Amino acid sequence: MKYTILSLILIQFFASRAQAPKYSNEFLHLGVGAQAFAMGNAVAASSEDVTAGYWNPAGLTSATEWLQVSAMHSEYFAGIAKYDYVGVSHSLGKKGVLGFTFLRFGVDDIPNTTQLIDNDGRINYDNVTTFTAGDYAFMGSYAKSLAIPGLSLGGTVKVIHRRVGDFAKSWGFGLDAGVKYRLNSHWKFGLVARDATSTFNAWIFNLSQDMQQVFLSTGNEIPTNGLELSLPRFITGISYNHSIGNPDKGFNIAAELDIDATTDGMRNTLIKSNTFSLDPHMGVQLSFKELVKVRGGVSSIQQFKAIDGSSSWGVQPNLGLGVGIKGFNLDYAFTRLGAAEAGYYTHVFSLKFKLSQPKKK
């Protein structure tokens, strides 16, 4: 059954390219870091480490170490799809902070059964080959604190490469921008403009004559070269932080509420219209001495219709833990990908460590 599903991906993918896309480059919105996953991805205002290069580049100004490195691996749909992330940040002192983010979401060893039946009408399994469908993103970020205390700005340049075997490939380009303001030791605010100028992907298709014939015989349109656009998405976040006792020796609780505003029409969110949709999500973290952290969050507030025509609301719960020792952090999240009632649970682990500048001899 697993490989039957995989064999359908090729034709389904090309058929979707022949239509006006609504959800373009969605792999860029999955998120990074088990900490964020556990908090329902509500970190636009509180992200202050290397992962801020993805969530809100303005938050990189708090990554004051010479070098921070983070990595994550997760698998979806019973291991069919694999999602990987690597991030690096480097402090330039008063000149700001640089960041680099790499993302890959891919499905490997997909059976290509378009030539399963030969010219004589017989099934020939020797004609079945495999291919990989992979999405890649290379993101460079820069952030700097401004003269106004607590205010910082950041930006990210994104280069996107998507490939489906030897049949199709695309290159894309986009920009993200972020601002962050720390009011005091308790309150922080964040604003992010994803795909601020609209992100584009230029697709090029390379289908053999035999494959084109398969598309026509199965009632599918033959895709043509073209552009795919990702419209801007705006994320606002407000975070509250409170320490119980000495901040370095006691407990600390932090909570954040984010609202994602999409501009590509009606989506299945809490608040929606024909032009935009609003998707709130929130998270909370309880930590002790920065050593142990317990996290929880709620996201994907969506409406579902039953077979009898009735409808109900569902949410996606998220849980996680974190452990930190001397600049090394291990985070875990139990979350799921997809609709709140139909998604697949997955375990997400991420690592992060900090390095000081080597001393000159």
Give, region by region, the residue ranges found by the protein language model.
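Subset of outer-membrane beta-barrel
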Residues: Q19-K361
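Bacterial Sec-dependent N-terminal signal peptides
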Residues: M1-K22, V284
